[in-house]
Amino acid sequence: MPVGRKEQIVDCRAVMGLGEGGGLAQRGTFAEGLRNDVVVVAMSPGRRHITKPVCEITYGIREAGIQTSVLVLDAGGGIPSDAPQGSLGSTFGLKPDEARQVNRHKLCVIHFGNVKSHIIYKARLFLKYVTIPTIIVCQSPVDMEDFAKIGIKTLDVMPLEPKTEGTIVEIITGVVRGESSPQKKIDEIIESIKKHLG
């Protein structure tokens, strides 16, 4: 008999984990929850892209009793090729399989980094193919208008010419990449999820 805990079954790891004990998920990993309620999406791990806050966010959401899947993008680093400054290094992208995996859920939480222009252009490419309501989690202070200016549909501000299928329903800023996420930020994410899951 479990005392004070709810069991969650997670079908985990498409590929072997990285680091000591395999604790870090590699790019292309999809860990599916028992029910398709929420999916948390992380950028690809690398020197600059650390998946650490995503692990803590996911743990907090699951601890709140919400069924949660996790996807680590295969090409999550860099910026999209259609961004104004272009992509000098790696190029951000979304595979058709990844879009299908995300779209099976009711709500998406995606963690971006701390460069404003990278965040908004990555979000536009992501939401071009992801059709479910999405919560953006990032470090940089951004608002709905920043996204709407480049054609991203948002709950508060609709662009004149929408370029996305999906809609941003909430933005949570101040979550630093590679650092432990403060409990108040995790609580804020959980409250947003509960609000938009209905």
Swiss-Prot record:
<keyword id="KW-0484">Methanogenesis</keyword>
<protein>
    <recommendedName>
        <fullName>Methyl-coenzyme M reductase operon protein C</fullName>
    </recommendedName>
</protein>
<dbReference type="InterPro" id="IPR007687">
    <property type="entry name" value="Me_CoM_Rdtase_prot-C"/>
</dbReference>
<dbReference type="Pfam" id="PF04609">
    <property type="entry name" value="MCR_C"/>
</dbReference>
<dbReference type="InterPro" id="IPR026327">
    <property type="entry name" value="Me_CoM_Rdtase_prot-C-like"/>
</dbReference>
<dbReference type="GO" id="GO:0015948">
    <property type="term" value="P:methanogenesis"/>
</dbReference>
<comment type="subunit">
    <text>MCR is composed of three subunits: alpha, beta, and gamma. The function of proteins C and D is not known.</text>
</comment>
